[in-house]
């Protein structure tokens, strides 16, 4: 099948007959109310029910005969119809969908847009785009409804692409781009391509491109591709860019649902009612065939600003025929094949895990309400601060809204333990209420649905495979209600208002926590982890400036550049103390003049004084009785939208909870913050236990108890199995292979007396010394090169003396043209003096980190095909000598970059592969721009192994795609490039591929399975290549941590879990295939396990095999002599994507080279530049053919 399409065949029910390309074309015969069709969104053949007969081009043209109430038709570009329509539909034809010819025994539209009636009809009206319609007169819709109602005039099983009984893609009254009885692009109850909670191929509240309360590809109230109410990569959590509440139905990953019986939907819904005329009809791809809408006397329709309002009677529940769900090709994550691993292990250890079990009654119900708050000026966006103030006032003034029984997400959703009044409420603030003085708002609240906790328990028990994200979202908001009122909220984290650590320049750090809800084997778990973040102090602006700039007094302002002050203050929030108000203002800048020199035109609106010029000093004295002490400095501009509002600095105070970016921390403070964050496992354990019991924490207050939730204050305990380390293949000093059996708890090996598996031959190489003009302490010593050669030889490499040695200065790195010229001179000299030789390697000595490093890498690797190895003299030189460990690490990188291998597994076919198998490992990652960068592209990197069975050499492909797009575009083509690099002959292609995907959350699994993996399969299928593929996601950004319950063997205090600790019980998913593996040895801080999730497994690994495979691969990372935390295909993909970011920033620096010479612009400022490199410039990321299959990126 091609992207979910169906080819040929017969559809015997209300589903589909046919096939086609991209899942929307159908051929053959559909004998129910489905479709007959063929082509790309086009249809041919015969449809014998209420569906369509048809065919044509681009999926909206139809030919042939439609014998039901569907269409007969055909034509060009899907909007013209020819032939005969025998029902209430259309006979017609023409070009581009606006003219119709032929005969239809019902209402038929002729070419000119008029209506003719060649036969009897029980139907109503059908309209085409751009034609005149005859419609029943509009009737009044109740004020509480914001949606259109569907006309009674449209016949059952209405033609068009819309309606219940619809054969299109959408929901009630809407299919494709149409509405009720509408063949145009808009209609009643129509929102673009959206149906009732259904978008694209989704169902009610499904994850298509949007739904009721859904924006993106995800679940309830979600924006992006993630989980419940989450915008980034998270699960249940934050609301992001937009959210319109929850829609009806269960939420999964866009697959078929087992639908409950129809239920009544409240008449107070903001949606329109469904016409009685829509009681019957068939369903093709759309709403009911996937996720039936629940309704009885009325139902909800999506909002549409373009809909015409037409009233009608409503259909009774008995008239609604819910068809059987259609089959779906959508893949779901594979289920766990066994009860977990039981492989031979070093031992079993008892662990505490920072998961706290949440108990609840399955009889409990959480009521979900949609909130819409409107101000007097409907076009003005209402801030979250205003939303909170309005909600609080209404709940305070109206006893029917109990605060203690509700949780508010700060935007559109309220969850309640009791029933709340619905409707429209006026909220007026009096003139004495300073912040919101005299403002009026309308608070509209409507019940969306009742969230049954029984649905969540059914999922946890495995009785349902569709995660109720709406229930999880409601519970998550409830859990966060109490801490959000008492702590500083930063995304999904909560921090104390007290800064416990003082960095000394107006900045300190506060402790906090992050928590998420996770369905697990043991039930619902609250995962709680400690956190630390730097904030500006909530002090006066003048005091802050004195601390930040190190001034003894404010008079030193004159010695500072105003731009430096503006750069630090702009965008910060302040309150003022010259009047009684809690209102927050944003600093927009400084006044050009000092306070004493600012005058303005004063107009007394009460008419007591004539207009006059007045100074700021006089005004504050007269108006507020306040003298200004610091008149010789500028005022702050707190105005907005071009209106200046100057306020003396001494009256302004910084609002608490304003983050200080860690990249702006002084070096000592940054190191201190990092050190504080890297707490020992014992310290982290104690911090978390304090937080779970804190009155400010997630268990604090009465709110969760009022919803019937209880959080166990004790951590979950589990058993961890410690896997045995693999035996490694190294060499002795003579180059003979040896087997290294690792016995230590850390699983590290030592190369002091041993060598790498395959040492490279480096005969022609060069040295570029950028430290030649530096002081003696920073300069590369003359002995360094000889020491490096000696260490490389000790590891089994054959390295001769360099054939080219050139000196330069760090200043050269500022000039891209000069740098390229220098590198070309190295190539020319080597070629000229050594018989056309090209340097295998260029060693570059630098004094410290420099943006010119990016330019050097970009030029060398994309333009010239040079492998470079940079090093910092300040790191390499310790006293009068160079560190042997540093030289060894440098040598390992060099060996890998030029084609050698550093370590190999003895059991490199992992015993569970067959001897005839050819296996390839692929890793994929997407590198996104910094948070403040709204322009730069995301960088994709895909890496793949080049050798089997060693599987320790990789090639990488790097490219750019749309800003912050996580879905890898052209994933199949990129993987195919790597397949070709792996094996030139078809018979040598791998028959088994394991793809490791990094950087995706649970809510993006659908994207990986049904978009990225499908794209790979489609590309492979075109060349007749059909390997077995297993897809595994590696998740790093989670909060789960393990704490050993006993001391280690050597008797030291409680530390990290041993390398190889795996957990695949209790805290994992109830039935899907995941586990936690802590492969690394944690020497600093608390080890973070990697969460591995098997999404698809055609190879058929059991738990023992997949755990051993991943753990063993972690020993093959080329840069170190210990197992790494993340499986190498993912680690390499991450490094290659970072290298792509380096290329992009180097290209921007070149484009922005008009900036003052010597100013080292940060990548952030460059990336935000208006002169952003276009996405079409693919050459930026195209690695030179000479090195693209080498590991240049390590």
From Swiss-Prot:
Residues of the Piwi domain: 841-1145
The keyword Transferase belongs to this UniProt entry's keyword annotation: no
Region span, Disordered: 1-277, 299-341
Skewed-composition ranges (Low complexity): 142-158, 256-277, 299-316
SUPFAM superfamilies the record matches: PAZ domain (SSF101690), Ribonuclease H-like (SSF53098)
GO molecular function: RNA binding
Biased composition (Basic and acidic residues): 1-98, 167-180, 215-228, 327-341
Gene3D superfamilies associated with the record: 3.40.50.2300, paz domain, Ribonuclease H-like superfamily/Ribonuclease H
Residue stretches making up the PAZ domain: 540-656
Xref: SMART domains: DUF1785, PAZ, Piwi
Domain of life: Eukaryota
Keywords on record: Plant defense, Repressor, Ribonucleoprotein, RNA-binding, RNA-mediated gene silencing, Transcription, Transcription regulation, Translation regulation
GO BP annotation list: defense response to virus; regulation of translation; regulatory ncRNA-mediated gene silencing
Gene Ontology terms: cellular component: ribonucleoprotein complex
Family under the similarity heading: Belongs to the argonaute family. Ago subfamily.
Designated name of the protein: Protein argonaute 3
Upper lineage: Eukaryota, Viridiplantae, Streptophyta, Embryophyta, Tracheophyta
Gene name in the database record: AGO3
């Amino acid at each position: 099948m091609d992207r979910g399409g169906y080819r040929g065949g017969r559809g015997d029910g209300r589903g589909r007959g046919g096939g086609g390309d991209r899942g929307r074309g159908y051929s053959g015969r559909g004998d129910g109310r489905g479709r007959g069709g063929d082509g790309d969104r086009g249809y041919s053949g015969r449809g014998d029910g209420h569906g369509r007969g048809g065919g044509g081009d681009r999926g909206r043209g139809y030919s042939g005969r439609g014998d039901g109430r569907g269409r007969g038709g055909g034509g060009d570009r899907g909007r013209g119809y020819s032939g005969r329509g025998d029902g209430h539909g259309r006979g017609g034809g023409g070009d581009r969908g606006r003219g119709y010819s032929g005969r239809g025994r019902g209402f038929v539209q002729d070419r000119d847009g008029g209506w003719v009636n060649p036969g009897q009809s029980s139907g109503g009206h059908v309209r085409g785009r751009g034609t005149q319609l005859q419609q029943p007169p509009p009737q009044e819709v109740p004020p509480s409804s914001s949606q259109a109602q569907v006309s009674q005039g449209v016949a059952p099983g209405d033609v068009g692409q819309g309606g219940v009984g619809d054969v299109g893609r959408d929901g009630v009254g809407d299919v494709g781009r149409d509405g009720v009885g509408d063949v145009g692009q808009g209609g009643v109850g129509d929102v673009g391509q959206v149906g009732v909670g259904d978008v694209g191929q989704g169902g009610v509240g499904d994850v298509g491109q949007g739904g009721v309360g859904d924006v993106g590809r995800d679940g309830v109230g979600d924006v992006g591709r993630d989980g419940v109410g989450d915008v980034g990569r998270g699960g249940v959590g934050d609301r992001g860019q937009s959210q319109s509440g929850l829609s009806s139905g269960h939420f999964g990953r866009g697959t078929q649902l087992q639908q409950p019986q129809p239920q009544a939907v409240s008449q107070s819904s903001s949606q329109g009612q469904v016409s009685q005329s829509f009681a019957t009809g068939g369903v093709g791809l759309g709403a009911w065939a996937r996720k039936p809408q629940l309704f009885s006397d009325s139902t909800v329709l999506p909002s549409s600003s373009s809909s015409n309002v037409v009233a009608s009677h409503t259909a009774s529940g008995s008239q609604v025929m819910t068809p059987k769900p259609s089959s779906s090709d959508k893949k779901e994550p594979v289920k766990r094949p066994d009860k977990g691993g039981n492989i031979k292990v070093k031992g079993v250890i008892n662990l505490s895990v920072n998961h706290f079990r949440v108990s609840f009654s399955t009889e409990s119900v959480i009521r979900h309400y949609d909130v819409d708050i409107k101000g007097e000026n409907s076009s003005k966006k209402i801030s979250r601060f205003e939303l909170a103030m309005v909600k609080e006032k209404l709940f305070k003034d109206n006893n029917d809204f109990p605060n203690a029984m509700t949780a508010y997400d700060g935007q559109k959703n309220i969850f309640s333990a009791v029933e709340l009044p619905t409707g429209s409420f006026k909220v007026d603030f009096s003139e004495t209420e300073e912040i919101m003085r005299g403002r009026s708002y309308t608070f509209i609240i409507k019940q969306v649905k009742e969230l049954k906790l029984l649905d969540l328990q059914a999922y946890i028990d495995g009785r349902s495979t569709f995660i109720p994200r709406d229930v999880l979202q409601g519970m998550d908001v409830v859990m966060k209600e109490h801490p959000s009122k008492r702590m500083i909220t930063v995304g999904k984290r909560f921090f104390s208002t007290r800064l416990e650590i003082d960095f000394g320049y107006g900045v300190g750090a506060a402790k906090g926590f992050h928590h998420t809800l996770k369905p697990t084997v043991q039930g619902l778990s609250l995962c709680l982890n400690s956190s630390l973040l730097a904030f500006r102090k909530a002090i006066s602006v003048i005091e802050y400036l004195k601390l930040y700039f190190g001034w003894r007094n404010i008079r030193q302002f004159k010695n500072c550049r105003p731009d430096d002050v503006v750069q630090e203050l702009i965008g910060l929030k302040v309150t003022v103390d010259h009047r009684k108000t809690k209102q927050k203002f944003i600093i927009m800048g400084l006044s050009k003049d000092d306070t004493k020199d600012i005058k303005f035109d004063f107009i007394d609106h009460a008419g007591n004084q004539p207009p006059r010029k007045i100074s700021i000093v006089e005004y504050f004295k007269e108006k507020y009785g306040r003298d200004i002490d610091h008149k010789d400095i500028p005022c702050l501009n707190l105005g907005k939208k071009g209106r200046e509002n100057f306020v003396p600095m001494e009256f302004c105070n910084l609002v608490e909870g304003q983050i200080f970016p860690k990249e702006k921390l002084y070096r000592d403070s940054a190191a201190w913050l990092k050190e504080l964050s890297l707490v020992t496992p014992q310290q982290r354990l104690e911090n978390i236990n304090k937080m779970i019991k804190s009155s400010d924490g997630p268990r604090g207050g009465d709110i969760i108890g009022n919803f019937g939730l209880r959080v166990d204050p004790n951590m979950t305990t589990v058993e961890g199995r410690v896997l045995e380390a693999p035996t490694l293949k190294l060499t002795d000093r003579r180059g003979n292979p040896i087997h290294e059996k690792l016995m230590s708890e850390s699983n590290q090996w030592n190369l002091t007396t041993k060598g790498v598996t395959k040492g490279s031959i480096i005969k022609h190489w060069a040295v570029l010394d950028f430290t030649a003009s530096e002081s003696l302490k920073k300069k590369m010593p003359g002995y360094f090169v000889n020491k490096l050669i000696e260490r490389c030889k000790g590891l089994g490499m054959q390295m001769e003396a360099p054939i080219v040695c050139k000196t330069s200065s760090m200043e050269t790195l500022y000039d891209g043209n000069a740098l390229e010229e220098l590198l070309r001179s190295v190539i020319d000299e080597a070629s000229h003096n050594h018989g056309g030789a090209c340097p295998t390697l260029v060693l570059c000595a630098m004094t410290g980190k420099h943006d010119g490093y990016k330019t050097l890498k970009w030029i060398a690797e994309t333009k010239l095909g040079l492998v470079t190895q940079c090093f910092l003299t300040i790191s390499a030189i310790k006293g009068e000598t160079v560190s042997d460990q540093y030289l060894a690490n440098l040598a390992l990188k060099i060996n890998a970059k030029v084609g050698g291998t550093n370590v190999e597994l003895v059991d490199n076919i992992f015993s569970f592969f067959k001897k005839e198998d050819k296996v390839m490992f692929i890793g994929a990652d997407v590198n996104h721009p910094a948070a403040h960068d709204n322009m730069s592209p995301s960088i994709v990197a895909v890496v793949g192994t080049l050798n089997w069975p060693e599987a320790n050499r990789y090639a990488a492909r790097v490219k750019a795609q749309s800003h912050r797009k996580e879905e890898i575009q052209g994933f199949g083509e990129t993987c195919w490039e790597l397949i070709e690099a792996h094996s030139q002959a078809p018979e040598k292609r791998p028959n088994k591929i394991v793809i490791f995907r990094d950087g995706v959350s649970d809510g993006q699994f659908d994207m990986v399975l049904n978009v990225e993996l499908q794209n790979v399969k489609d590309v492979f299928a075109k060349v007749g290549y059909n390997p077995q593929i297993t897809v595994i996601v590696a998740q790093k950004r989670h909060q789960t941590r393990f704490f050993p319950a006993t001391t280690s063997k050597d008797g030291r205090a409680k530390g990290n879990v041993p390398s190889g600790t795996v957990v695949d019980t209790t805290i994992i998913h109830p039935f899907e295939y995941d586990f936690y593996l802590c492969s690394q040895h944690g020497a600093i801080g608390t080890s973070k396990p990697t969460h591995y999730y098997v999404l698809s497994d055609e190879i058929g690994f059991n738990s023992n095999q997949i755990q051993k495979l991943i753990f063993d691969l972690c020993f093959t990372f080329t840069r170190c002599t210990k197992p790494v935390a993340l499986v190498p295909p993912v680690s390499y993909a991450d490094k290659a994507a970072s290298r792509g970011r380096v290329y992009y920033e180097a290209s921007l620096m070149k484009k922005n080279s008009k900036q003052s010479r010597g100013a080292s612009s940060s990548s952030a400022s460059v990336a935000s530049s208006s002169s952003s490199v276009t996405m079409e410039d693919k050459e930026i990321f195209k690695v030179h053919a000479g090195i693209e299959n080498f590991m240049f990126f390590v």
